[in-house]
Amino acid sequence: MVRDRVIELFRKALAQGADDGRWPAAGAGFSVEAPRDPKHGDFAVNAAMVLAKQAGRPPRELAQAIVEAVRAADTAGDLAGLEIAGPGFINVRLSPDLWLRTLARAVAEGPDYGRTAVGQGKKVIVEYVSANPTGPMHVGHGRNAVVGDGVQGLLRWAGFDVTREYYVNDYGAQVQTLARSVHLRYQELHGRTVTMPPKSYPGEYVKDIAAGLKAEYGARFLDAPEAEWLTLFRDHSVQHVLGMIRGDLAAVNISFDRWSSEKALYESGTVDRFLRFLEEKDLVYVGKLPPPKSKKGQPPPQPQPDEEGVTAAEDLTLFRSSAYGDEVDRPVKKADGTPTYFCADIAYHWDKRQRADALVDVLGADHGGYVPRLEAAMEALGASRKDLHVVLIQMVSLMRGGESVKMSKRAGTLVSLREVVDEVGRDATRFIFLTRRSDAPLDFDVELAKRQTLDNPVFYVQYGHARLAAIFQKAREAGHAVPDFDLEAARTLASPEEQDLIRRIAAFPDMLAAAALAYEPHRVAFYLQETIAAFHSWYTQGKKSGEKVIGPDPVKTAARLFLCRALKQVLANGLAVLGVSAPDRMESPETRDIADDV
């Protein structure tokens, strides 16, 4: 990375200056950032401002000394200019040849170009999807899945040791409701008339599960008490639904390294051990929740049970989360002594933290209020809040021709992820889910996703990759060999559009690293769209001006082909990070072969 070269030169210069006694030894705390205005150079370095107090010198005076040391360290001539600005920033301009050599690096590293070691092998567990095993995945789950997979992919490219994890909520009330729904359908299959309660699961898959149980057990559980069949029906139903979920995930090419079970946390004694740990650390006590707040001028409302049946009137075992920044202390055991869902959840995070250096949770935006209590739990358990990062996923609105689509015609329920993938394809599904920040609502237009037109974002990027492949096909037909890097030839890449593409290619590794550290895979989608737009513009202008990629000048042709080679590699790598294919052949928007368009 060109930025790495700047860092290397400044570190070398600062170390040499410290050895010579010109200033104290510097840490690695200075920053190297691209300025917002390109007129200020390629990078701005704040080393003098960081070191000034320790050195006892004015920042601008120290900056001048550092500039002289950096110039002495730059024996290869990689820097074209150094100037002092503002309170002591050092603006850096790189030599044109250093930029050009990034093209050679992109081609040499091939499918690994963009990988960095910023993660230094740090172990990270990324937990995502974790949809309840009570039905097929809907499009909201799909966005969580794709964003989570994008996050883990970015972290791998940045040198982290990543475990992809799915937490299966197979213990609580919802899976019991599923089991009871299946039992009602089981009775129905035996000829009985049943009425499905309002909170039961209505999907056709429930009938399929019931049919499987009928085939295996006949009428054995028809009149049996619930205690005899509930666990069996629950476990059978959960496994059936998990099979559906695995199939839905496979449709978007997502898999997991580990499936962690809530039920297993209880059966293995992890939850009990965790509760004992809390007691030993004096992190829990028996008390009552604060009473519900009353509206102005009205009497206080009566305490109402929450979804787990807990009320403020009961004596509960409370976790001292308010001591760690939460609003109130949270119950970890109900009045009857059974653990709460929150207890199992922080026990799970306790377990994860023992297996990794850092945790990433990808959660629906409706869990935003849950984040402070998780952060409080992490701190109470002796970890840092920084060891947990939560990515929130906003809602998806499915659109068709500008109209909102809420229900599936096939199932009468929320539109499933599989239905969308079957209609628009895996690549379009994955890419469009990443065309906005995850914490912003997303409109997913099914008709747009199917179009082979340049207003379809995934088609636009893939079409650019295919156009580059077609350029090489045409070059071979014209007798041009795929060129190796030639610095003299590369110096002919002097137009503003070519220089812009070179800088975009050079920025790719830094962009990936920054996106990984911010847990923001949409940055890659933005980069690809902006970069391919720059390519299409350059290519079109070249055709109009007579400066085509394949032209009469063999030196310029070789240079432009090498630029295209590096750009094609970057596009392929960027799409690979997002789990999207990079086709070499596509139909053009006008439905003719793309090779006719180069």
Swiss-Prot record:
Region (Disordered): 288-309
Keywords recorded for this protein, A-Z: Aminoacyl-tRNA synthetase, ATP-binding, Cytoplasm, Ligase, Nucleotide-binding, Protein biosynthesis
GO cellular component: cytoplasm
PROSITE patterns xrefs: AA_TRNA_LIGASE_I (PS00178)
This protein's record includes keyword ATP-binding: yes
Subunit structure: Monomer.
Protein name: Arginine--tRNA ligase
